[in-house]
Amino acid sequence: MNIKQEDDHHHSHAHGDNHCHCGHDQEKAADAIVRDPICGMTVDPQAGKPSLGHGGRIYHFCSEHCRTKFAAAPEDYLTAKDPVCGMSVDRSTARYFLKAEGEKFYFCSAACQAKFEADPAAYRDGQRPTAKPAPKGTLYTCPMHPEVVSDRPGDCPKCGMALEPMGIPPTDEGPNPELVDFVRRLWVSAILALPLLALGMGPMLGLPLREAIGEPQATFIELLLATPVVLWAALPFFRRAWASVVNRSPNMWTLIGLGVGTAYLYSVVATLAPGIFPMSFRGHGAAVPVYFEAAAVIVALVFVGQVLELKARERTGSAIRALLDLAPKTARRIDAEGNESDVPVDDINVADRLRVRPGERVPVDGSVLEGQSTVDESMISGEPLPVEKSKGDPLTGGTINKNGTFVMSAEKVGADTVLSRIVDMVAKAQRSRAPIQGAVDRVSAVFVPAVVAVALLAFLAWAAIGPEPRMANGLLAAVAVLIIACPCALGLATPMSIMIATGRGAGEGVLIKDAEALERFSKGDTLIVDKTGTLTEGKPKLTDIAAFGRVGEDRLLSLAASLERGSEHPLAEAIVSGAEERGVPFVEVTGFEAKTGKGVQGIADGTMVALGNSAMLADLGIDPAALSEKTEALRGDGKTVMFVVFDGALAGLVAVADRIKPTTAAAIQALHDSGLKIIMATGDNERTARAVAKSLGIDEVRADVLPEGKKALIDELRSKGAIIAMAGDGVNDAPALAAADVGIAMGTGADVAMESAGITLVKGDLTGIVRARRLAEATMRNIRQNLGFAFGYNALGVPVAAGVLYPILGLLLSPMIAAAAMSLSSVSVISNALRLRFAKL
């Protein structure tokens, strides 16, 4: 397909309608495009061309014919649909426009235009479906500048790169059009650069090509070969360079644009008008040297780096796509008449009844209404054994039904499901910024101006005191300095590591909310953990009953268990289960009241019953001394004791034990080895807590801690200079998770706990914390290595390119070698970041 791009190079910079919230003006009035809405030609409003007012605006036309056509049906020519993203584009101000096979196409951004140019047939002829428009409310961000956020697609105003959608990506997005386009441009530039290299470097390699062809003819051939590379293949680079200048955000594209543009324009003038150059520009034989091969090879090598970067970024999304693939695409819905039909999962509503057959994935979160089965929940819990499910049991979308059929009720759908929240968390984390990036940004802000200054100084120094041809050598040194300096490596150092680390973490059940959590956890020195559910199984069992006075054990357990049926605490469930196993009857309870961190009370079978810990007894003014010996013995065995009070008098106690998880001891040792001090903060009494802590080697115990006491503990430790990570799983833990330097939500837990935490573990045990710690340390180590590569490379490369080694070794770096080194620096950073995919967690 023949594509004709309209000549708007002098206008090509970041899309002015992008609504980016980054503090930069999107366009200046002087740069506004005025386009004939009929034929698409650009029009100078001051040139006296025909114009027409409509809808409060003035439209300008290239000719009276176009004006007449517009006047007949103006509404038909006001806007056009972007064939790539489907957005409506104002035809009279469209910045991006081209013609293909006689048709006119308008685009909202350079990114959409590049996608169209990469595969016009896909968007023009409808040979395959175009990408679905992003969901309403989708925000877009720059992969290199995550602080840039836009409410529509387009180009980054800082660097000109295509903005990418934030949040959950589509699962059927297909190949990245930008990658397809860049690969095509790479092939063209590489194929044309090879003969340029042969012509330009032939004399150094003993190839008499220039002599055989003739110097003037060889130079014109170089001009013909280099022009498509610079003016077509490198066009995206120049657009980004122009965007950086217009928006006063100098970056790597500024340097590349200056370097390639300078080498090419100088060579064109040297070819077409060599007589204007003085002797200081002329080499052997009084010929003016040209650098077409340098310009073309630089472009090809930059494309190598860009293609590798795009492929690496594409691979980092594989973790998200793997999670998305866990969700089924359809579900079997049962209507009010009992008829069943397959519907897209997106069409499921809360309270819908769904049938799940053996081997199918549970479509959304909900609970069992009818039937029973076993469900593989390993994607959430990490446990390999299927879990039995019957009426009333909860279900998580994406888990696999093994051997039975059941009917479920949908309770959480769409973005509210556990799986969707996990995917959204991973996607946002990959776009987040680590605090260390702030230091990099401050360096980058002065880096590009400093490099331009060094290039200018290098040129002046060579021109003043360099050997002949000193002006040509000065130009060579200046171009080499511009090209070798690579802020790209600096820009990639942190984001690439964060993207890969968050994806790797998701695959290991460690969900990172943002990059700051990783950096803080790597520096943390103190970890606060709860006992129940974190160190222990979280499934306590009733072990002992001790009645006091004339109250029988069955009566004691009956009233205590009846009261606890109103509580959701794991210890309450243990007492209720124990009563059911013993066949003790339950009675009616009224006036139930829960005392946070203390216990419960209410009226059971006409008796005022209270059940709780020592704090509950203190509130009631009851002395537990009569049962102190029994209490201490049970606590010494690591059991949790709860006192039972009937009508204001001590009636007895019940004891519950929670088995320590098999993985806990090894995990605590691993956390100790990583330099963490471990503090157990629990609502249990001192004796029980210390018994558990001693068996596990925990450093410090804080017992009888109420939920609000955990936040006070964090404040106390922080005042001593500690960097604190806090692990919790419930609503009561949310304030402490938010107050800690790093909050760690254990298991899928409560929604508010996940929102308050920087890290969420899909499996609620210490092994997940070990993985998170290792991931955090590996990520920060990787970032420091990347920054070392980037800073070290520039510290060495820029002086060498400027020519500091020439007086010693007679070495003047070619811009081609500089471009190769620049690409190598980016490749080294990307390759090093990719090692995180294989880090031992």
Swiss-Prot record:
Compartment(s) of residence: Cell membrane
Protein transport among keywords: no
Record: active site: D530
Membrane-spanning ranges: 186-206, 218-238, 256-276, 285-305, 445-465, 474-494, 602-622, 638-658, 742-762, 800-820
Membrane recorded as keyword: yes
UniProt-listed Pfam families: E1-E2_ATPase, HMBD, Hydrolase, YHS
Known catalytic reactions: Cu(2+)(in) + ATP + H2O = Cu(2+)(out) + ADP + phosphate + H(+)
Keywords (A to Z) from UniProt: ATP-binding, Cell membrane, Copper, Copper transport, Ion transport, Magnesium, Membrane, Metal-binding, Nucleotide-binding, Phosphoprotein, Translocase, Transmembrane, Transmembrane helix, Transport
InterPro entries recorded: ATPase_P-typ_cyto_dom_N, ATPase_P-typ_P_site, ATPase_P-typ_TM_dom_sf, ATPase_P-typ_transduc_dom_A_sf, Ferritin-like_SF, HAD-like_sf, HAD_sf, HMBD
Mode of membrane association: Multi-pass membrane protein
Induction summary: Transcriptionally regulated by HmrR in response to Cu(+) ions.
EC number(s) on file: 7.2.2.9
Highest taxon, organism lineage: Bacteria
One CC-aspect GO term: plasma membrane
Primary localization class, coarse: membrane
One GO term (biological process): copper ion homeostasis
Binding-site residues for Mg(2+), renumbered to this chain: D729, D733
Function: Involved in copper efflux.
Protein family (similarity comment): Belongs to the cation transport ATPase (P-type) (TC 3.A.3) family. Type IB subfamily.
Protein name as catalogued: Copper-transporting P-type ATPase
